[in-house]
Amino acid sequence: MKSAKQIATALLVGMFTFSAVGCSMVEKRPEAINSKVVATIYGNQTITRGEIDKLAKGTVEQLKSQYGDSYEKNEEAVAALKKQKEQILTSLIDQKIFLKKAKDQKITLTKDEIKTNVDDVYAQYQQEFKTESEFKSQLSQYGYTVAEFKDQLKNRAISNKLIQQVVKDVKVSDDEAKKYYDSHKNSYTQSPNTVHLAHILVKTEKEAKAVKARIDKGEDFATVAKQVSTDGSKEKGGDLGDIQENDSNYDKTFMAAALKLNDNQVSAPVHTQFGWHVIKCIKKTEYPVKDFNSVKDDIKQTVLSTKQKSVYQKTLKKWESQANIDKNEKNLM
């Protein structure tokens, strides 16, 4: 009697034979797919489909959970997977560039740095799970063995050490800090400035203009909101309550328009990703600005981070232009 494994093997052979009609059978073999080159760097370093797919395993599991095992038939799911694979590809390319540059500059990790950035970090991750086997299972879901994960932590630490070398000469003067302070005073008030807002959300500009016309003619804002707004705040007359001026939970375009309003002023129609808004500023509450010297160190750190990021990005762009990157993104999917 044939074993279950032999029967399964026979079924798989039959499936591949059937699906190969009209195309090259070798293209259907997993090893052929895994070995497809997605990118070449420096002319001799490659990134394969298998490497990408391995690191995309976690995303695939999430998509299966959300869309079912046939997620590949869903355009939204496929688009999400493609986007994730593109991000993985970019990360792998940059990592290879970093590691080559680090090698060229003879940047390595000391024993203490390995303990801090590899062993200790690994232990921190492991503590998030009840058992070691549960942690290893999670690693496997995201495409890593323990050794590979530790290698990844080591590579990240080397890359960070290289980046610190790149930005080590970046400084911030008192004049730069004062200039930033003068143009961002609202971020350094004794308490966060707030604005009490209400809004009416509709689908089209035509509807928004009609809403604004009704308000301009003297109709009560809250009454109109309850009648026509599509937002959940309609039951409260569109009232959103007090919002901090720098609240990142709100759409930037929405907040920019709202902050231009004076107390009891109503905006013209404002378009955002959610639709068309008519916004009312009920009341602004503003607080005194802190003295420059009391916030100078914080500002210097903020400006330093921005300048370092700019130097890093320019350097990376230069390195990428020198890396002879050849992408074949059709092999991603």
From Swiss-Prot:
Disulfide bonds: none
Location, primary (coarse class): membrane
Domain of life: Bacteria
Function: Plays a major role in protein secretion by helping the post-translocational extracellular folding of several secreted proteins.
Taxonomic lineage from the root: Bacteria, Bacillati, Bacillota, Clostridia, Eubacteriales
HAMAP family per record: Foldase_PrsA (MF_01145)
Protein name: Foldase protein PrsA
Membrane topology designation: Lipid-anchor
InterPro entries noted in UniProt: Foldase_PrsA, PPIase_dom_sf, PPIase_PpiC, PPIase_PpiC_CS, PrsA_foldase, Trigger_fact/SurA_dom_sf
GO biological process: protein folding
Reaction(s) catalysed (UniProt annotation): [protein]-peptidylproline (omega=180) = [protein]-peptidylproline (omega=0)
